[in-house]
Amino acid sequence: MSFLDFIQNATSSSSCDMAIDLGTANTLVAITGQGIVINEPSVVAIERSTHRVLAVGHEAKNMINHTPDTFSAEHPLHDGVIADYDVTEAMISAFINKAAPRRYPWQPKPRIVVCIPCGATSVEKRAVFEATIQAGARQAYLIEEPMAAAMGADLPVTEPTGSMVVDIGGGTTEVAVISLGGIVTSSSLRLAGNRLDEAIAVHLRDLLGIKIGERTAEVIKIKIGSILPFEDGRERDMIISGQDVLTEQPKEVTIQSEDVRDALQAPIDEMVVHIKETFKKTNPDLASDIISNGILLTGGGGLLAGLDRYLSQQLEIPVWTSETALTNVVSGCLKVLETPTALKQILMRSK
């Protein structure tokens, strides 16, 4: 192989564009032609003595678990937006390099599509854009999460029909009505999976006198959490460990799924009110489409047992949970990159 051939091969092989679902709890990265290559926690390990970024994602979580006194865990995104710019930039850069390392300095940087909450301010949008460019993007595009989720779930977003999406992530619940390649009306509620975890922890502290951490609360939600009785008619229970509220000594208790349901009632009902308010802003023709086609429930929070049935009862509209709820957003971002017409029609509109 000649040196020219070597340069051409190296350049072409590295010219890959990326989609990033920059979430409060997890970050997913997908590459054109490859699909999803990274799905890791949105956490960064910072050395306490020097304040240096040492690791991100799974590696950061493992370091902190093994040597908690030496490192601190930073979650650079809160409620779906950047809380610490420098740490976010470092995290994005690390994930970009891990997904597609640049082996030669002349290799082109990737174009990157990043999702943002539909309620993000212009300052918050600018922060995501700048962080992505500084982290190594040749060009950066922003797309609102509900639009990306709808595309990832193969909803007819460019057609003259109304589609409604409820995307429950770690930090925000995004609600949007989509038609003709644009978001007709939308809203963003900074209440989502993390707040459900907090509600569980607070309720168990008050009910059983036990203090638990956020990881334990999340496990409880996933294993025995529900907002309606389980369809098989059987309730669940689970043994958990924590600290006694009064003595701070180790404590182990058995909790019931009914206890978790009580904890989740108030925040879920707040979501219902939010969805109803967004639907009220929809024009009659699109509202008719939504009533006929149903509402897409997506995001990790959308997987809570019984949530689709509960929303359907409260809204009096069919609600269905996507089979790919965890990956719809990043898949939709990737679809935009792989479809030139979508890149022009949807991304340019969202500038």
Predicted regions and their residues:
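Nucleotide/phosphate-binding catalytic cleft detector across ATP-hydrolyzing
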Residues: 1-168, 176-295, 302-351
